[in-house]
Amino acid sequence: ILFSGDTVARRLLYGLTGCPPLSLFCNDLQRLQQLPIRNIYSAHDRAALPPDYPSYMSRMLQTKLSAAAETWQYPGFPLMRRLVTGDEASPDYFDAAVPDARFQEENTHAI
């Protein structure tokens, strides 16, 4: 069993304070797949997440975030790029928000 706190969760608010680059975070999510995890309990989900959810998160962040057109802004937060996939009642639901400036900067350095 993995108690993941805010790191592996269906709702991810990423990159506001002291976080590694998104690419490193995705690599670390993939590394979790090497562990014998049967269930994942996050700080915010009411049910266990499947053991392959970290890989799913990584795949969504690496392949879908760049195409996400939705942005989100809340007082005191920077402009966030938001990705929402799946229906909230389904196991494949994922809602991620990443500071748009940070995302743009990482993509510029990757080119």
Label for each model-derived stretch:
Residues I1-R31:
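Catalytic core of the metallo-beta-lactamase
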